[in-house]
């Protein structure tokens, strides 16, 4: 597990609301550093499918689809293109938590950390595009623990 979650970035680096350009640059550098550590242990180049699980990823899917309310059926299994996501993440990084909280698909507890999540997603997209020629992401309502349990159960 890499230490680069949206809460960590928001609390430690992206403290302004919205984050300053300098804070975003620092957050980008931090995420790149963490992803470099991941690359040392994970064969990124052999990745064929990127699955974004829960949290920031499901929120991005709801926003990208223009949903008026959070709809887990529309979100789970949705496929998002990196080019469209980059436009969306840039918008999320620019807006204040007050602006973001107006959107009904952004959970109230996520409005103040979603910009940090957007920085993480940008870093992941850059890495996968460059090293594995992956340009889409499939969204899952499930999280990593569901996957671990399924694997242990032999599913």
Short names for language-model regions:
Residues 1-155:
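Helical "lid/coupling" subdomains associated with nucleotide-phosphate turnover
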């Amino acid at each position: 597990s890499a230490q680069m979650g949206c809460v960590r970035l928001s609390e430690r680096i992206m403290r302004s609301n919205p984050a300053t350009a300098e804070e975003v640059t620092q957050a980008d550098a931090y995420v790149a550093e963490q992803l470099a550590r991941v690359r040392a242990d994970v064969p990124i180049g052999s990745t064929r499918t990127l699955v974004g699980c829960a949290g920031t990823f499901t929120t991005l899917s709801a926003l990208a689809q223009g949903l008026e309310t959070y709809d887990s059926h529309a979100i789970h299994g949705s496929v998002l293109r990196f080019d469209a996501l980059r436009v969306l993440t840039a918008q999320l990084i620019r807006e204040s938590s007050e602006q973001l909280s107006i959107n009904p698909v952004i959970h109230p507890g996520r409005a103040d950390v979603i910009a940090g999540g957007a920085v993480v997603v940008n870093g992941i997209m850059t890495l996968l595009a460059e090293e594995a020629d992956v340009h889409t992401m499939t969204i899952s309502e499930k999280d990593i623990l569901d996957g671990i349990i399924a694997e242990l159960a032999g599913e």
